[in-house]
């Protein structure tokens, strides 16, 4: 039980690192939540701080989810504080990743007012199901490039993830996943565990729900478009 709690706490604290708020303070001396959309996430960092800072913020937010879901769980498996949790490891990684997402959304370091958690959730899934997530990222980038609406890309990507897992698992009969070997020593497991399918479906519904204001603005034509212009 102690090991499980330690995983949750460490993952939450990693997720709580307020990347965009720190970047706003360092680069412009501002609280990014008082500008743009008012959100402490990567998309608002692109709007307020420019594409370079926005890219760095987004990559760090993604890394928070990956680190929480894979290395943190792996570390405590190798160095448990008592018995290691007797549960499906993919489920444990998902729980740890979600602790990081909760930390990102309700960061203890910034008055529990953070971002929406999309990048951190994506990072968690990149660590657990990298091949499926590469496909999802491709769909996201294509949707954003064509529409210039990040919200459209986020919603379509959320819907695509459980569909891709289901198609690869049941249509192509790939079982619980595949292992990839790099440089003879580095192994990456691309999971297709059924926990991912259930989780992906829940996340898709949750992301559509959290983007309901964006959906209303899309239909009314008032949603902010992403500018690809050069801004430092």
Swiss-Prot record:
UniProt keyword Transmembrane helix present: yes
Localization, UniProt: Cell inner membrane
Cited InterPro entries: G3P_acylTferase_PlsY
Chain segments annotated as transmembrane: 4-24, 56-76, 90-110, 124-144, 152-172, 191-211
Any one GO biological process: phospholipid biosynthetic process
Enzyme Commission numbers on file: 2.3.1.275
GO MF: acyl-phosphate glycerol-3-phosphate acyltransferase activity
Disulfide bond entries: none
Membrane topology: Multi-pass membrane protein
Reactions accelerated catalytically: an acyl phosphate + sn-glycerol 3-phosphate = a 1-acyl-sn-glycero-3-phosphate + phosphate
Top-level taxonomic group: Bacteria
Family matches, as Pfam families: G3P_acyltransf
A GO-annotated cellular component: plasma membrane
Pathway of action: Lipid metabolism; phospholipid metabolism
Claim: Aminoacyl-tRNA synthetase is one of the keywords in the record: no
Main location: membrane
UniProtKB keywords: Cell inner membrane, Cell membrane, Lipid biosynthesis, Lipid metabolism, Membrane, Phospholipid biosynthesis, Phospholipid metabolism, Transferase, Transmembrane, Transmembrane helix
Subunit and partners: Probably interacts with PlsX.
Its job: Catalyzes the transfer of an acyl group from acyl-phosphate (acyl-PO(4)) to glycerol-3-phosphate (G3P) to form lysophosphatidic acid (LPA). This enzyme utilizes acyl-phosphate as fatty acyl donor, but not acyl-CoA or acyl-ACP.
Protein family (similarity comment): Belongs to the PlsY family.
Protein's name according to its UniProt entry: Glycerol-3-phosphate acyltransferase
Name of encoding gene: plsY
